[in-house]
């Protein structure tokens, strides 16, 4: 039997990201709790290659939603949805945040400080947050030679109006060229009421390439509902797109650096491969690489990162917020099978890679490192 970690009664995605019961303040000491997969529980009969996988709780934070590593810096930076960024080094958090923008956002519903990425030289932090009026804001903060985040340097790169409170997505990554990739949800409510996702004139429901200097935007993909977390690996952008009524999806935007035409992922003409809004057309949409139905497996996919070391090297690791299940899939075949590794992890809101490590972040506060 898979080891169960206990699931909190909080929901993400199809039902919206809700406020969790979180610990007061910040645990700066770290912990040593470890959960191991028992032999034979890899999901593949006779395959013991994943038997030594474990989740190690390294500490807790108020509503952690993202983590990033910075060039020429051995520390990690964890994001609290309430609007702060925290440095983690030598097994513990620093006592004070390195950046606090809590006055510019509110960590409630599906809003807050949602994403962090660093420039390739480590001199700039890029943020994705919802402003107090709910609009998506892509911003930059300078990091000086001493590694200090210069709060006064914060500048807005791009603002995107949000018509509803949910489906803000919130992640961003930096390409080798230095441009940003930003995933946008369809604007929210339910059923894509404004029909934004397939609308070429809207920035909602899209993957955007953003110039961090002038804020200019190029649309790379459309037809997305709420791609909450994304991961760029080997020129492929992995998208965990939260579903509506029935299906959760993992999709891939291939050859990102060479995209010449807008790629269509189908929403809201389709939910996964099932017809959805009959008035929407998507005749050549790219099907998800994996889709799973609402039920025992859950109801809200939490992406997702490609592991670069260990037994899961080269596999995409993802979770479901409702069921607390953690899976991986092979990245080198067209129709991979989901292999389940953990069950009942408490409210896993994100699976993210920082440096060569993969972390599972619980909205309830716990930060797990994937070992093995």
Predicted regions mapped to residue ranges:
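Bacterial signal peptide processing site
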Residues: 15-19
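Beta-propeller domain segments
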Residues: 22-43, 82, 111-113, 179, ...
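Beta-strand-rich domains and repeat architectures in extracellular enzymes and scaffolds
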Residues: 54-83, 299-306
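Surface loop/turn motifs at the tips and blade-to-blade linkers of beta-strand repeat domains
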Residues: 56-62, 99-108, 157-164, 218-223, ...
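Conserved beta-strand position repeated across blades of beta-propeller domains
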Residues: 68-69, 117, 173, 231, ...
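Blade-loop segments of beta-propeller domains
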Residues: 94-122
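Asp-box/WD-like beta-propeller blade repeats and closely related beta-sheet repeat scaffolds
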Residues: 137-174
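Conserved blade-ending motifs and adjacent loop-strand segments that build the rim/top face
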Residues: 335-355
């Amino acid at each position: 039997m898979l080891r169960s970690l206990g699931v909190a009664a909080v929901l993400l995605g199809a039902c919206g990201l809700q406020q969790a019961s979180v610990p007061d303040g910040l645990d700066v000491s770290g912990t040593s709790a470890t959960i191991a997969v028992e032999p034979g529980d890899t999901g593949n009969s006779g395959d013991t290659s994943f038997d030594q996988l474990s989740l190690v709780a390294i500490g807790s934070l108020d509503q952690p939603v993202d983590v990033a590593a910075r060039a020429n810096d051995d520390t990690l930076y964890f994001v609290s949805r309430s609007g702060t960024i925290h440095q983690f080094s030598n097994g513990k958090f620093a006592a004070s945040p390195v950046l606090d923008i809590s006055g510019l956002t509110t960590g409630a519903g599906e809003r807050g400080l949602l994403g962090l990425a660093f420039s390739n030289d480590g001199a700039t932090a890029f943020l994705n947050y919802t402003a107090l009026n709910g609009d998506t804001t892509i911003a930059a903060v300078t990091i000086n030679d001493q590694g200090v985040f210069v709060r006064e340097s914060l500048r807005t790169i791009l603002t995107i109006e949000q018509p509803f409170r949910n489906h803000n997505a919130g992640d961003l990554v930096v390409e080798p060229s230095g441009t940003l990739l930003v995933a946008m949800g369809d604007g929210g409510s339910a059923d894509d009421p404004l029909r934004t996702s397939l609308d070429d004139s809207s920035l909602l429901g899209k993957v955007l390439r953003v110039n961090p200097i002038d804020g200019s935007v190029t649309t790379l993909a459309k037809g997305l509902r709420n791609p909450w977390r994304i991961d760029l690996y080997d020129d492929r952008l992995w998208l965990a797109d939260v579903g509506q009524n029935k299906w959760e999806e993992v999709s891939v935007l291939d050859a990102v650096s060479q995209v010449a035409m807008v790629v269509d992922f189908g929403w809201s003409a389709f939910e996964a491969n099932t017809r959805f809004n009959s008035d929407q057309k998507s005749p050549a949409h790219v099907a998800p690489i994996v889709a799973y139905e609402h039920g025992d497996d859950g109801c809200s996919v939490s992406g997702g990162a490609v592991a670069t070391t260990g037994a899961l090297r080269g596999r995409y690791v993802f979770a479901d917020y409702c069921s607390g299940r953690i899976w991986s899939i092979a990245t080198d075949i067209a129709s991979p099978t989901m292999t389940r590794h953990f069950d009942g992890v408490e409210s896993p809101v994100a699976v993210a890679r920082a440096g060569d490590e993969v972390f599972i972040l619980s909205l309830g506060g716990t930060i797990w490192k994937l070992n093995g």
